[in-house]
Amino acid sequence: MSKEKFERTKPHVNVGTIGHVDHGKTTLTAAITTVLAKTYGGSARAFDQIDNAPEEKARGITINTSHVEYDTPTRHYAHVDCPGHADYVKNMITGAAQMDGAILVVAATDGPMPQTREHILLGRQVGVPYIIVFLNKCDMVDDEELLELVEMEVRELLSQYDFPGDDTPIVRGSALKALEGDAEWEAKIIELAGHLDSYIPEPERAIDKPFLLPIEDVFSISGRGTVVTGRVERGIIKVGEEVEIVGIKDTAKSTCTGVEMFRKLLDEGRAGENVGVLLRGIKREEIERGQVLAKPGSIKPHTKFESEVYILSKDEGGRHTPFFKGYRPQFYFRTTDVTGTIELPEGVEMVMPGDNIKMVVTLIHPIAMDDGLRFAIREGGRTVGAGVVAKVLG
């Protein structure tokens, strides 16, 4: 089977299905690929091809995820679907599958259920920016008033977690009927695709964001000065531009006097490239791994934040025992470990392996961070959890 050429002409958008177990997420995923392939070209994926998802590792955590792709006339979508609730929790927290928007599937026969709420909350915590609702199994509900009631409940739930519930697109459909080729319900899948195109804005590309490079190594080159190396996470750095060195110590300023890659001198380094950046007037000992180079004013160092974390189960190589308040692990951000203390939510005494939990973390050194930054929780170099900065506090 030859690999299809990756079409670079269309904007690329990452989405995924979320929602309560058995509300039809995987059936909808199959229906979208099938109906869009039939309408706009591309390849359909059967339910059972999606449901037996392969395992992947993200930050040392095993997650079952299915990836499908589909096209509308204006965009190319990469779509993730997870078989189990725990896989969603892990996926969203580790950022293994970053979503530019999510399709929340709610069965009209049940209305919102506990995992519906949990996935909306997780979406808020981990920074999923847009949610579109697919009200599924509408072929099984004859009562218009009941559908309106369920719709109202979903809108209220979204609003509770700071999503714009009143303005959220809601499509009433039947994934199964659409998959079976019923034209009336296929039209609802096309309607859903239309909302994906219009409601989720085109994501900003990494290269268009402000420059950031996590420092991996520092060298001093006699006669030339200090070079830091790392992979440019976002943006572009040009020779002659000012940069800030942020994190761990007080923020310092410098100027980039050279960029090199594979021993060749360049005039700029771009997102995704591994580069060496030569800095003016900085001594080797003034800079260290774990700091970042950044566009001045674009990122600040912080020590305290609210986070959403997933603690690995024993089977995943995590802890065998719970931990309590006063737990002091290392938090691994980008390229370095920093010790931190935790505060658990009111009424939570201990955290078991396999749990996901909200916690406030205070680090002993500041780290350059924004909301949405991912981290690992480690004990002596072994990963015991994964987390995301939900809200910077100080």
Swiss-Prot record:
GO terms for cellular component: cytosol. Keywords: Cytoplasm, Elongation factor, GTP-binding, Hydrolase, Magnesium, Metal-binding, Nucleotide-binding, Protein biosynthesis. Mg(2+) binds at residue 26. Gene3D superfamilies: P-loop containing nucleotide triphosphate hydrolases (3.40.50.300), Translation factors (2.40.30.10). SUPFAM superfamilies: EF-Tu/eEF-1alpha/eIF2-gamma C-terminal domain, P-loop containing nucleoside triphosphate hydrolases, Translation proteins. It catalyses: GTP + H2O = GDP + phosphate + H(+). Residues 19-26 are annotated as: G1. It is an enzyme of class 3 (hydrolase). GO terms for molecular function: GTP binding; GTPase activity; guanosine tetraphosphate binding; translation elongation factor activity. PROSITE patterns: G_TR_1, G_TR_2. InterPro entries: EF-Tu_GTP-bd, EF-Tu_GTPase, EFTu-like_2, EFTU_2, G_TR_CS, P-loop_NTPase, Small_GTP-bd, T_Tr_GTP-bd_dom. Its EC number is 3.6.5.3. Residues 10-204 form the tr-type G domain. Monomer. Belongs to the TRAFAC class translation factor GTPase superfamily. Classic translation factor GTPase family. EF-Tu/EF-1A subfamily. GTP hydrolase that promotes the GTP-dependent binding of aminoacyl-tRNA to the A-site of ribosomes during protein biosynthesis. This is Elongation factor Tu.
